[in-house]
Structures are given as structure tokens and as C-alpha cells.
């Protein structure tokens, strides 16, 4: 019982700032949310560049060098064409190219088509390797040999 009380005293002592009983408990310091301040700075900078909103954009896809795609569904897009600046607002999701294939084919450029071909070839090779691995699991029996006698 006294062991439990000692543990409680240690825990209580770490939560107090001062030494005495009348001192207030320590308050947890929290990091401020900076996204609102950063967003305001970004909006001010974009306003200086004179961006204009672009309406009726259903989706935005950004192709990465590793073959994945950053997909924005129903984003807000602002653009300043003379400054070659585009701002995309929304929740971006990392997706593989194969997840978006039926609807994304008309958006693919020559580089992306090449990566899609490589992806298809690697997928076919993986299928072949899996079949070969399944066949290699069971060894072939050799006629005339008794493996049980070697174990003993």
C-alpha cells in the first residue's frame, strides 16, 4: 500500500511547478496552429501576383517521377498566367497510376505513357514469377531413392 502512495507522490510532484501544496499545476504548452497564419500570407502573396479563380475544374492530377499520382478531387484553382503561377486548394491523395487508369488515359503525356507501359510489363512479370514460385514449392520425386533412410 505504501508503495502505491510513493508512486502517486512521484507522479503528483512532476505535475507541480513549486514545492508547496498550494502551488498550481503545470499547464501543458501547446504549439500554436500555424496553418491559418501561413494561409493568410500565401493569400496576400497570391493577391500581389493577381491570380484569378478558374471555374469548373473537376479534378487535378499531378504525376510524380516514381509513377504515383497526386489526385485532387473537385479542387479550387487560381491562376496567374503571366507569372506562370497556379494555386490548387483541396485535399490531395497519393494514388497509384493503376487506380486512375480508365479515366486518366486522355491526360497522359508521352512520359506517363512510357511509365504506364513499364508498369504493365512489371505487373505481367510479377504474375509469371508468382506462377513459377508456386511450381517450385514442391520438389520432384526421384525414382529409386529413399529419403527416409537418410534422415535416420
UniProtKB/Swiss-Prot annotation:
Where is composition skewed (Basic residues) in this entry?
23-32
Q: Which UniProt keywords apply?
A: Cytoplasm, Nucleus, Protein transport, Repressor, Transcription, Transcription regulation, Transport
Query: Its GO biological process terms?
Result: protein transport
- Function (record text): Component of the nascent polypeptide-associated complex (NAC), a dynamic component of the ribosomal exit tunnel, protecting the emerging polypeptides from interaction with other cytoplasmic proteins to ensure appropriate nascent protein targeting. The NAC complex also promotes mitochondrial protein import by enhancing productive ribosome interactions with the outer mitochondrial membrane and blocks the inappropriate interaction of ribosomes translating non-secretory nascent polypeptides with translocation sites in the membrane of the endoplasmic reticulum.
Q: Which residues form a coiled coil?
A: none
Instruction: Give the originating organism.
Output: Neurospora crassa (strain ATCC 24698 / 74-OR23-1A / CBS 708.71 / DSM 1257 / FGSC 987)
Protein name in UniProt: Nascent polypeptide-associated complex subunit beta
Q: Where is the NAC-A/B domain?
A: 36-101
Q: Where in the cell is it found?
A: Cytoplasm; Nucleus
One Gene Ontology cellular component annotation held by this UniProt entry: nucleus
User: Which PANTHER family would you find in this protein's record?
Assistant: TRANSCRIPTION FACTOR BTF3 FAMILY MEMBER (PTHR10351)
Primary location group: cytoplasm
Q: Which SMART domains does this chain map to? A: NAC
Amino acid at each position: 500500500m505504501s508503495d502505491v502512495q510513493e508512486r502517486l507522490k512521484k507522479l503528483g510532484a512532476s505535475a507541480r511547478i513549486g514545492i508547496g501544496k498550494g502551488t498550481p499545476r503545470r499547464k501543458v504548452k501547446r504549439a500554436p496552429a500555424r496553418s491559418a497564419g501561413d494561409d493568410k500570407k500565401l493569400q496576400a502573396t497570391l493577391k500581389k501576383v493577381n491570380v484569378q479563380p478558374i471555374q469548373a475544374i473537376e479534378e487535378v492530377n499531378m504525376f510524380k517521377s516514381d509513377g504515383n499520382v497526386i489526385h485532387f478531387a473537385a479542387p479550387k484553382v487560381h491562376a496567374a498566367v503571366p507569372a506562370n503561377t497556379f494555386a490548387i486548394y483541396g485535399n490531395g491523395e497519393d494514388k497509384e497510376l493503376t487506380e486512375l487508369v480508365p479515366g486518366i488515359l486522355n491526360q497522359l503525356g508521352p512520359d506517363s505513357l512510357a511509365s504506364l507501359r513499364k508498369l504493365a510489363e512489371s505487373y505481367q512479370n510479377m504474375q509469371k514469377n508468382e506462377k513459377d514460385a508456386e511450381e517450385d514449392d514442391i520438389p520432384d520425386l526421384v525414382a529409386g531413392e529413399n529419403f527416409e533412410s537418410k534422415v535416420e
